[in-house]
């Protein structure tokens, strides 16, 4: 009975993920209940009506989720798969449910316990893929435009089987982009900004929106983890921080170091495209700072991190995003605002804002 959806999330953030899916489902007048097991790395949402699970994964835009890394419709838990034939029961769950899917992903939750199953998942994938193709459940070749079959193992011999839609899911295995830490980067935080680019900016827009020669500002830049990503894309960067910047970045000639407080700094040039900010400060204070930059027209796009409190983390994020949205609208500014708890985030979320410049008289056009 496929009336459930499974959502992957960061271990320890199951309650936030559950609150989010419950709220978004209710907005569509779809009702059910979330099953939460702490530190499991996933949430199940069981709908009261049978067809509603499929409707949820079609109608809730995946990019609007903050805490969910992936979402899929699943059936009942398959338990005690026979060691001599694990494939047949899985295939049986999908017969009549989906046809000619474009991809198979045999996955686990992102926890230390579950990762021990990854080797088994890789081993199972090849025979399972062949069997699914034989039954026409999977297309003969991978197809990025067709649904994805998910087999989600929660324990040895126990899995959920289901599907997601490729136009409304995470394109990444386990919902996690695989990024390699560059050995010459000043800090591991560099991966947060790189992942944010992958998550928030479509690949076919990188050349236009992450273009060589753009001007950028990094508030709270030291030692330069986020500045590094901008340097790699041949931008010119104002790095704002009272601390020391990595000499390797200064040697590129692309970075100007402003020894100043990121909350007090005001730009001196008018053609800044990107603002990035990863400062350890209260979420409200950071949100107000970025909003000020957007209202003043000091930047076109911004990526920033919000450090989360110990309690009411989902509410905190929602309140800050709503506050920003309201203040921008009060100033007649259109903007796209999205937030995500990235794989490389910890007790924090990353927010992306893109200002959509109006063609009103006296306002700068969006082309610099």
Curated annotation (Swiss-Prot):
- Tell whether Methyltransferase is among the UniProt keywords: yes
What sections of the protein cross the membrane?
A: none
Catalytic function, reaction form: cytidine(2498) in 23S rRNA + S-adenosyl-L-methionine = 2'-O-methylcytidine(2498) in 23S rRNA + S-adenosyl-L-homocysteine + H(+)
Top EC class for this record: transferase
Q: Which domain of life is it from?
A: Bacteria
- What molecular functions are annotated in GO for this chain? S-adenosylmethionine-dependent methyltransferase activity
Which residues participate in S-adenosyl-L-methionine binding? 189, 222-225, 241, 261, 278
InterPro entries given in the database record: RlmM_FDX (IPR040739), RlmM_THUMP-like (IPR048646), RNA_MeTrfase_FtsJ_dom (IPR002877), rRNA_MeTrfase_M (IPR011224), SAM-dependent_MTases_sf (IPR029063)
Q: Specify whether S-adenosyl-L-methionine is a keyword of the entry.
A: yes
The UniProt entry, under Pfam families, shows: FtsJ, RlmM_FDX, RLMM_N
| Active site per UniProt | 307
Gene Ontology biological process terms in this record: methylation; rRNA processing
For this record, the Gene Ontology CC terms, alphabetical, are: cytoplasm
Where located?
Cytoplasm
The EC designation for this entry is 2.1.1.186
- Could you list this entry's UniProt keywords, alphabetically sorted: Cytoplasm, Methyltransferase, rRNA processing, S-adenosyl-L-methionine, Transferase
Entries under NCBIfam families matching the protein: PRK11760.1
Q: What protein family does this chain belong to? A: Belongs to the class I-like SAM-binding methyltransferase superfamily. RNA methyltransferase RlmE family. RlmM subfamily.
Could you describe the subunit structure of this protein? Monomer.
Q: What is the purpose of this protein? A: Catalyzes the 2'-O-methylation at nucleotide C2498 in 23S rRNA.
Q: Which HAMAP family match?
A: 23SrRNA_methyltr_M (MF_01551)
Q: What is this protein called?
A: Ribosomal RNA large subunit methyltransferase M
- In which organism is this protein found? Yersinia pestis bv. Antiqua (strain Angola)
């Amino acid at each position: 009975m496929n009336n459930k959806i499974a959502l992957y999330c960061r271990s320890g953030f199951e309650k936030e993920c559950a609150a989010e899916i419950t709220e978004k489902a209710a907005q569509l007048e779809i009702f059910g209940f979330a099953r939460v097991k702490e530190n499991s790395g996933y949430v199940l949402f069981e709908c009261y009506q049978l067809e509603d699970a499929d409707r949820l994964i079609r109608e809730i835009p995946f990019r609007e989720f903050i805490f969910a890394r992936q979402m899929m419709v699943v059936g009942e838990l398959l338990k005690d798969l026979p060691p001599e034939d694990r494939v047949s029961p899985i295939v049986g769950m999908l017969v009549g449910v989906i046809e000619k899917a474009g991809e198979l992903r045999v996955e686990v939750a992102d926890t230390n316990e579950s990762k021990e199953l990854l080797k088994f998942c890789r081993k199972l994938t090849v025979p399972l893929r062949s069997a699914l193709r034989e039954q026409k459940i999977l297309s003969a070749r991978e197809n990025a435009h067709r649904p994805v079959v998910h087999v989600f193992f929660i324990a040895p011999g126990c899995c959920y089987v289901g599907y997601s839609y490729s136009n409304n899911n995470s394109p990444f295995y386990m919902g996690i982009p695989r990024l390699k830490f560059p050995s010459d980067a000043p800090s591991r935080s560099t991966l947060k900004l790189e992942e944010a680019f992958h998550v928030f900016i479509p690949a076919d827009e990188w050349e236009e929106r992450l273009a060589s020669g753009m001007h950028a500002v990094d508030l709270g830049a030291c030692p330069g983890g986020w500045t590094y990503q901008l340097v790699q894309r041949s931008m010119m960067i104002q790095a704002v921080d009272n601390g020391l910047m990595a000499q390797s970045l200064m040697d590129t000639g692309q970075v100007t170091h402003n020894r100043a407080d990121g909350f007090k700094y005001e730009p001196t040039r008018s053609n800044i495209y990107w603002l990035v900010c990863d400062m350890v400060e209260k979420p409200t204070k950071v949100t107000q700072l970025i909003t000020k930059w957007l209202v003043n027209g000091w930047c076109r796009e911004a990526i920033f991190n919000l450090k989360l409190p110990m309690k009411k983390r989902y509410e905190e994020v929602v309140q800050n995003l709503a506050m920003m949205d309201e203040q921008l609208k009060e100033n007649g500014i259109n903007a796209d605002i999205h937030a995500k708890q990235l794989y490389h985030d910890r007790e924090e979320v990353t927010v992306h804002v893109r200002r959509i410049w109006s063609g009103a008289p006296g306002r700068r056009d969006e082309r610099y």
